[in-house]
């Protein structure tokens, strides 16, 4: 069940507002469609536009009257479950609520929740580790700390906050307890991106950044014959591109590269050969691959272009330079200077 009202205060009409290239609710519907455990997907809404979007995705729509917004999600779930039972649903069937305001939740989280229910969980909730130095107030207003020692956040004990992204139980458990939160409870920990719940425009701005950031892979090495210039340039590029999903790829036997990047906070992946790099690129499907390891072969670059939107190579005198989307080199002047938006 994806409950989606037409009205919202913090971000007006947020469920139909376009995030990147599609309405916000489409992100969650597509995640649900990608869940192997999802047999029936229902968008519960009071809004014609939301209903139309859901129908275009091919999922079921259940309508409700416009409310004051004081209705709880358990109230909505009660209506949907009542209808499902009339249509032949069984008490053992999993019932999963997925919030449309959590656009980065992954479909496999729904599948994971259903599997946990099959294995005896009463409820399954997605949570994010939100440990901080927190305070509360006593009944008389006196501040009280909720920690024992003032230490760095990473050293505090885990403290989990519900994301609201996924809450799962069975129809039978809901009938018996009249709530979606039933013991024994299992927690599925997600990262900060999946945990994002859009309430205000500040959240929306974060969502726009997450939706539009690029995936970048830098292939580089250092060594006695190669020197260190390549890794220093890769470091400069990495620092400029750090706001994107960045991965530095080095050879497993390149000890100098390993030691160099161990001093810096970037994700480094080691590969054994070109085949391993191709396999990594095929799985990652990056927006951009940057090559900085001298002369490349034409077939090498052509293979990488099958997996990436663009391939850029540096100081490359090999045949692969002709196949790359862009060559950056101080070794010679361009015979034809390409300028303008199409070449940026």
Task: Name each region found by the language model.
Residues 42, 48-96, 104-112, 272-284, ...:
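Short phosphate-binding loop-to-helix
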Residues 223-225, 233, 239-240, 251-338:
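Active-site and donor-binding regions of nucleotide-sugar-utilizing enzymes
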Residues 16-19, 215-231:
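Short, glycine-rich nucleotide/cofactor-binding loops
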Residues 181-206, 323-343:
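A nucleotide-sugar donor-handling region in carbohydrate enzymes
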Residues 1-12:
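N-terminal nucleotide-binding beta1-loop-alpha1 segment
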Residues 26, 41-45, 126-127, 245-253:
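Short internal beta-strands
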Residues 73-79, 102-191:
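Conserved core of the sugar-phosphate nucleotidyltransferase
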């Amino acid at each position: 069940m994806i409950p989606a009202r037409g009205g919202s205060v913090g971000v007006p009409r947020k469920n139909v507002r376009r995030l990147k290239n599609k309405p916000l609710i489409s992100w969650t519907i597509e995640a649900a469609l990608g869940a192997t455990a999802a047999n029936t997907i229902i968008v519960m809404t009071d809004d014609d536009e939301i209903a139309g979007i859901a129908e275009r995705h091919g999922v079921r729509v259940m309508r409700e009257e416009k409310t004051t917004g004081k209705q709880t999600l358990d109230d909505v779930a009660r209506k949907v479950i009542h209808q499902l039972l009339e249509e032949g649903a069984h008490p053992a069937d999993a019932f999963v609520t997925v919030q449309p305001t959590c656009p980065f939740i992954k479909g496999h989280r729904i599948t994971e929740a259903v599997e946990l229910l099959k294995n005896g969980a009463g409820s399954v909730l997605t949570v994010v580790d939100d440990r901080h130095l927190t305070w509360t107030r006593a009944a008389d207003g006196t501040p009280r700390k909720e920690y024992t020692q003032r230490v760095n956040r990473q050293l505090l004990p885990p403290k989990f906050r519900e994301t609201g992204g996924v809450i799962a139980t069975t129809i039978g458990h809901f009938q018996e307890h009249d709530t979606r939160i039933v013991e024994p409870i299992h927690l599925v920990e997600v990262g900060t991106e999946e945990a994002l719940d859009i309430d205000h425009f500040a959240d929306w701005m974060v969502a726009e950044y997450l939706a539009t950031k690029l995936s970048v892979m830098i292939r580089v090495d250092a060594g006695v014959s190669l020197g260190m210039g390549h890794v220093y340039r890769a470091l400069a590029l990495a620092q400029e591109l750090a706001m994107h999903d960045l991965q530095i790829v080095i050879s497993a036997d390149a000890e100098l590269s390993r030691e160099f990047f161990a001093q810096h906070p970037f994700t480094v992946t080691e590969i054994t050969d070109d085949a391993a790099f191709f396999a990594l690129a095929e799985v990652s499907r990056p927006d951009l691959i940057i090559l900085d390891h001298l002369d490349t072969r034409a077939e090498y670059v052509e293979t990488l272009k099958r997996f990436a939107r663009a391939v850029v190579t540096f100081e490359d005198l090999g045949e692969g330079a002709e196949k790359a989307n862009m060559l950056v080199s101080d070794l010679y002047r361009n015979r034809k200077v390409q300028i303008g938006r199409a070449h940026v």
